[in-house]
Design a protein with these regions (language model features):
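Loop-centered beta-sheet repeat module
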Residues: 155-201
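Alpha-helical positions within canonical tetratricopeptide repeat
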Residues: 63, 119-122, 126, 185-186, ...
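N-terminal beta1-alpha1-beta2 module of alpha/beta enzyme domains
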Residues: 28, 37, 41-49, 53-60
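Extended glycan-interaction surfaces of carbohydrate-active proteins
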Residues: 2-42, 65-100, 124, 129-157, ...
Length: 356
């Protein structure tokens, strides 16, 4: 796509507004290539990749190259990254497996949009090291430990949202490897076992049911068959969506976040409910600023921004990705669709101790 030809989504976002939001992301990028949450804020590798994906969609390919090369330069020897960076310093030395895996989704998306295999080959060793690191933390029941603390000690449990994203990243990594003629090792096997646990043993994951991401992320990541995915979205809609205002980050509070709202729209598109996706994405207009940035969240009924006056790069990025999914403007618009083989993981049988 050329940023000169961005399509309008009437009542949601215009082509000019998409370009303005992309320029806002570019304005946040540091000379190193890092994309922080906001000016002077920290950066985490997952949201950094999300922002790079949005830049690719909007045609800012060189800026996306800089973002991915920043990530490559800071990858640790085992394939991981720290959780938060503030400029060139480490703000939080925890290592989150989901955060580490997402580069695979980012580079596969890059290939889908641009067709550029040269840059993808440059980045493939980064992707391979990251996915091999994440795969090494899979447990006997198929789940993947969610993090290691700053001393390198792994947590004993797994998270549903993070594991769903890891599943998606593993599948993207396999498609990337296939496109490049590179080996993907055991990534499919790891994804099969993880997908089985996600689809059939949700109790194996730490209970976080109040969070909207635990509701829609198994759908967004392609873990569930279409019928089950639609049922999941329908069952949780009233609990997690606040009237016409968007998605509650946490179901117990009327705090609507634009990033979760945009991701929910992506999940709705994934199951073929484009009209519902348009309706829910339209709620993000309340969050939009004139400069193309988006308020992170709005608390109701007072309609105050929370965190106060905070805009965030990942929110702007999620809006652009949802726009692309709905307008099909780039060849990467279906990165979060249900293209993955839904028959892979229902019957692992004796290899899954949770089935015994």
């Amino acid at each position: 796509m050329s940023v000169k030809t961005a399509a309008d989504l009437p009542g949601v976002i215009t082509g000019d507004e998409v370009r303005a939001t992309a320029r806002h992301l570019v304005s946040l990028q540091l000379p190193s290539g890092q994309i922080p949450w906001f000016p002077g804020g920290h950066c985490d590798p997952w949201n950094h990749v999300e922002a790079a994906m949005a830049l690719v969609v909007a045609g800012h390919v060189e800026e996306a190259h800089a973002a991915y090369r920043w990530l490559a330069a800071r990858q640790l020897g085992d394939g991981s990254w720290f959780n938060y960076y503030l400029g060139e310093t480490v703000k939080d030395a925890r290592i989150d497996t989901n955060v580490c895996a997402y580069v695979a989704a980012g580079i596969w998306h890059y290939v889908a949009v641009t067709g550029d295999l040269v840059f993808a080959r440059e980045m493939f060793p980064v992707v391979a090291k990251a996915l091999n690191f994440v795969s090494s933390w899979q447990m006997d029941d198929g789940t993947i430990r969610w993090s290691l603390d700053s001393a390198g000690h792994p947590e004993r449990y797994a998270l549903l949202t993070g594991s769903s994203s890891i599943y998606h990243s593993l599948r993207c990594g396999v498609m990337l490897a296939d496109a490049l003629g590179e080996p993907s090792g055991k990534w499919n096997e790891v994804a099969d076992r993880l997908g089985h646990a996600l689809a059939h043993h949700p109790g194996a994951f730490a209970p976080k049911n109040q969070f909207a991401m635990d509701w829609y992320y198994p759908v967004l990541a392609g873990v569930l068959p279409i019928s089950a995915a639609r049922q999941r979205l329908s069952d949780g809609f009233d609990r997690h969506v606040l009237d016409f205002r968007g998605v509650r980050c946490v179901s117990t509070n009327d705090w609507v976040t634009a990033a979760e709202t945009a991701e929910c729209a992506l999940a709705l598109v994934a199951v073929g409910w484009e009209d519902r996706a348009l309706d829910i994405l339209a709620a993000t207009r309340r969050h939009r600023r004139d400069d193309g940035a988006y308020w992170t969240g709005i608390a109701y009924p007072d309609e105050v921004t929370f965190p106060a006056a905070e805009t965030s790069s990942y929110t702007a990025a999620a809006i652009i990705l949802a726009w692309d999914a709905l307008t099909t403007s780039t060849a990467g618009h279906d990165t979060f669709s249900h293209r993955f083989d839904q028959a892979r993981h229902p019957a692992i049988g004796q290899s899954c101790p949770l089935d015994r």
